[in-house]
Amino acid sequence: MSDYFDRVERQIVRNVEAGLPRASRRPNVSGYLAIAAAAVVVIVVAGAFLLARGSSPNPPPAASHSVTVTFKATAIDSKAPVGALDPVVAILRERLDSVFPGVRVSRAGNEIIVTAPKANAGTRAGILALVTTRAQLDFYDWEANALTPNGKTVASQLETQDPTAVAISQGSGNGAPGGPFAGSMKLYDAVTLASKQPPRASAVNSRITPQYWMFGAPGSAACEAAAKAGGTVSTAGQHCLLNGPYDNRHALLTGLPAGVSPSDGQILVVPRGTVVLQAIPASFSNPTPIDDPSAQFFVLKDNVAIYGSDIANPEQRSDPNTGTPDVTFGFSSKGKREFQNVTANIAHRGDLVSSPGQTLNQHFAVALDNRLITVPFIDFKQYPNGINGDNGADIAGSFTISSAKDLATILRYGPLPVTLTVKG
């Protein structure tokens, strides 16, 4: 267990040092998601998303020392982090105390200090994972928002059977919708496509600011310097991510890798109304960082159908059929309406684009912190008018009781209003 935590800790720290989004999480990919007869949506993810005491069948080593970790707060959507830190302290206390009883959380200026008085080999990695997870959960109509390289939505090209649109919608080969190589792109290509989109400011956007990225040219000295600073090797023939994403240019140009100056990179700006989401990975046993050459991405119009704030009462339960731990939640009154509406629209479109010899079920996508968790389909024949949200949803996967409780806790208290990255 300690080896696993150590590996994850190294990955998180490497991401932090590169100035990248934190706490990569890995879903359990099992192909298309079945919609249960009782109309309960089962969202398959990995319990390995949350690293916590008890997430292995082997008990952790006995606690023998204290661990203190300091985190720096970065504003989200240009809000001053200082004013947002009081609720952050309360949220983190709730998150951490269920996993590490007795943990102390305090603030000093723009920093959050977490101390676990009784620590073992996995404590620091567990704290990193729980604290650096913002837990912003968003639901999208997949085909209505996913873009192909020509900038058009998948939905608008299904009747003409555009090959890339069909691959993104229905999967390709062994790749399920939302997974790597099912119409996905490398990071630079995805961000370039996203940067060419017009601003689409809307009340249903997941963020209210542009997003700034910096890339180095293939084979450039900047890529070599960034790879050296991160303890990796640059990939020949590919653009490298030097920094980002951030919501302002100043943050992007601060904390560049050693040996990289602001003039060394290409800055791409993704306007409000467009998002870049990392694909569902083929394997979740080893987290793939955003700057890994094998990482794949999709570009979507940022029209959120249901927010994480629209879910209610997330709890750790046991699947009645298998006995395995999972996380259940209901929807708020607004969430129920929106879930019915979006699944109805998806079902109607599936009926429209299908033909007697070809069924093209359509999908919704669930993203957690800009990473796709799953892209399940709606069976338009079984649910022609969508799915009633009264029965809520069930997140099932490779959970232990402890890790299922962790996810329920994180969802219960909502996303952090700031991004927290480890200091030092």
Residue spans for each PLM region:
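Membrane-interface helical sensory segment of bacterial ECF anti-sigma factor regulators
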Residues: 1-3, 17-61
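A structural signal for conserved, well-ordered secondary-structure elements
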Residues: 3, 7, 11, 48-424
